[in-house]
């Protein structure tokens, strides 16, 4: 997949430089639709994704990567391309009402639609000649094109005391209730954790608070129906789509 990126530089006058970026791989993710995806990486530790590198990349290209616990993954918000971009956006952390400049947020509606996620590296392997990089804590849509991968270096990049603007701490988690109570018994522990952790993040638009509404999303091949009332997620049904 070739991506046309246009960059503007200012010298004596404006001129345009065009540079083609070739994606290096693609993401396999339990999230096949945007609704329900964690808004940030590491919020759902059970969200395991796999990055499959293109055939031209051998194990030599990732030699030494397994020595790092976390990696930066640069990717394309491919599902937002048709929606364009805006200078001002409404961050969910501000209730979806107050606007901020796009460069002060992590909105997918950016000029070049490029995203950046910090993922926990699980392991690297080679299956049928294709390099696969398995990560935990994913926040990426299935089929996302990957542009670059770099190791996370804590002593350089970790700044826990840095100001964080309008973002104050981790979001509050919702409590989970299964109805009927024996519903999760039909699921594996991994699938149950993934569904619970994903819905505890409250995937609804920030401006939406309709306790009587039943929502639906698809997670790891399951159609999940739920409603949210008084900081509780009530999971009503989980149906396999396979």
Regions found by a protein language model. Give the residues of each.
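Short coil-to-beta-strand transition motifs
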Residues: 18-23, 109-118, 220
């Amino acid at each position: 997949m070739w991506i046309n990126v246009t960059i503007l530089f200012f010298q004596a006058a404006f001129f345009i430089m065009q540079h083609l970026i070739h994606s290096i791989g693609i993401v396999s993710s339990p999230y096949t639709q945007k609704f329900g995806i964690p808004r940030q990486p590491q919020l759902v530790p059970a969200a395991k994704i796999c990055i499959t590198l293109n055939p031209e990349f051998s194990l030599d290209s990732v030699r030494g990567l397994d020595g790092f616990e976390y990696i930066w993954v640069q990717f394309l918000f491919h599902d937002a391309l048709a929606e364009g971009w805006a200078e001002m956006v409404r961050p969910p952390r501000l209730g979806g009402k107050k606007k901020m400049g796009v460069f002060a947020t992590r909105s997918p509606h950016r000029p070049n639609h490029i995203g950046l996620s910090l993922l926990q590296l699980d392991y690297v392997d080679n299956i049928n000649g294709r390099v696969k990089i398995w990560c935990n804590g994913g926040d990426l849509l299935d089929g996302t094109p990957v542009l670059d991968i770099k190791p996370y270096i804590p002593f350089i990049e970790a700044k826990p005391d840095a100001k964080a603007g309008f973002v104050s701490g981790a979001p509050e988690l919702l409590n989970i209730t299964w109805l009927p109570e024996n519903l999760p018994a039909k699921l594996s522990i991994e699938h149950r954790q993934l569904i619970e952790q994903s819905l505890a993040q409250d995937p609804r638009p920030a401006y939406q608070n309709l306790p009587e509404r039943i929502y639906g999303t698809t997670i790891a091949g399951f159609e999940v129906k739920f409603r949210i009332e008084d900081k509780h997620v009530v999971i009503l049904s989980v149906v396999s789509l396979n």
